[in-house]
Amino acid sequence: MDNYWKGKTICFLGDSITEGVGVVPGERYFDFLSKELGFTACGYGVNGARYVDLYEQALRMKKEFGSNTDAIFIFAGTNDFFLNTPPGEWFNYAEEDVAALKNDDGTPLKIETRKVRQFNFDTDTYKGSINRLMSFLKHNYAEKQIFMLTPLHRAYAEFGPLNI
């Protein structure tokens, strides 16, 4: 079957679901997709991984493949939830002097102090860890497709008292 993914190389970052814990070798979710769609799959999932750990997976992927992957899938978040990783913030705010007005050659005519958003890279938080990972991926794989899958719904899971 000809399709967009045939002959491509796709890397998968994630936790035990991506690693394939509890399934027969060759029956991870992306193994089925690979067989059906004809792409080469490279799995980097590690049991128990949180978003902070996916950065190491991305470094390993970069070392092994360079930029020779066509797409990257990220499937994580369950362990962050289970282990009560604080959500954190996407951005920090700071004040910065900026050119509010420039002349035709770009020389600043007026400088003002303005509030700016800066990405939060605090790896003790869920959002900071995602920012760190995505910053690395976007800088190293700017022309590649990156897919983020949300954590599985766990209707009957028993998490800690800080999780709702």
Where do the PLM segments sit?
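Serine-esterase "nucleophile elbow" of acetyl-processing enzymes
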Residues: 1-67, 72
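Alpha-helical cap/lid subdomain in secreted, periplasmic
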Residues: 59-164
